[in-house]
């Protein structure tokens, strides 16, 4: 990934909005799906090229993308678990809780859902693959991302 820090955005007809990525020190710090990009967002970045290809149907799990997860440890653990859900598959919030070290699915359902909703980098931390809980991406975006992946 490019080491260029900044905000990058490109419009997606499939999502009917922009995909906006913020990068610092070679790591993704945020991903959002605004209807209008930040005024200083630039349209050219290798990650945006990959996202466009992905949205066009080219499989990409984005496993090599480094994401800066600056969240409390328990939320970070949940999001790190979500990163292990493979391209083209889905999981439930209960399954994510079961797979996350230190989480008890019967007691921590709320914690898992809060972590998913606080995801700073949807797509690269694929909360859209958790089919019964909302991530931080708009619901319509999550549905379209699952459709792209055939799940």
Show where each model-derived region lies.
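Low-complexity, small/basic-enriched stretches
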Residues: 1-63, 131-151
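Nucleic acid-binding interface residues in structured DNA/RNA-binding domains
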Residues: 4, 61-151
């Amino acid at each position: 990934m490019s080491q260029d820090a900044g905000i990058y955005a490109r419009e997606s007809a499939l999502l009917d909005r922009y995909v906006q990525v913020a990068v610092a020190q070679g790591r993704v710090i945020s991903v959002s799906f605004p209807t209008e990009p930040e005024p200083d967002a630039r349209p050219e970045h290798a990650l945006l090229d990959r996202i466009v290809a992905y949205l066009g149907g080219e499989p990409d799990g984005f496993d090599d993308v480094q994401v800066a997860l600056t969240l409390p440890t328990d939320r970070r653990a949940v999001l790190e678990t979500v990163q292990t859900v493979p391209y083209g598959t889905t999981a439930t919030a209960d399954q994510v809780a079961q797979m996350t070290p230190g989480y008890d699915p019967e007691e921590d359902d709320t914690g898992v859902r809060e972590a998913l909703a606080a995801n700073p980098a949807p797509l690269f931390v694929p909360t859209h693959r958790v089919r019964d809980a909302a991530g931080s991406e708009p619901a319509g975006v999550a549905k379209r991302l699952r459709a792209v992946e055939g799940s």
